[in-house]
Amino acid sequence: VSSDTQFVGYYRRPELTAEAVSDGRLRTGDIGYLDAAGYLYVTDRAKDMVVSGGMNVYPAEVEAALADVPGLAELAVFGVPDERWGEAVVAVAVVTDPTLDEAALIRAARERIASYKKPTQVRFLAALPRTASLKVDKPQLRRAWAEGIGLSPD
């Protein structure tokens, strides 16, 4: 992306600026496609993509596929290191129905999307952590997952 109003860089962060701006163009990190009519559809962020067993999994696609599961309030999908597959797709859920468990969510995913895209594990929280801009704080969730802090399987 380039424009007259584009930012010129990160304040005192030349390494981040070098990653984001090249030849005057901003690398947004968005992944998307153009349809036959030329409309651009943004499907996810490159940094959020999970590569599991050589297959690309877009967390936003998994989240959208499960968005209407009864009793599911919110879902955050991301990748974690996995010895066999490189990365595994996992999820953290907020539920309004206490009977909605890990097996039910994985089963719902299997019915709606390709099997390789389904979460291999689901953990539960009362609320998803948020950044100052109210986005789900996936880096915090990844750290919590790695450390096993505050995430329960039921």
Question: What are these language model-derived features?
Answer:
Residues 143-154:
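Acidic/polar alpha-helix N-cap and adjacent early helical turns
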Residues 3-4, 8-9, 16-19, 24, ...:
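AMP-binding/adenylate-forming catalytic core of the ANL superfamily
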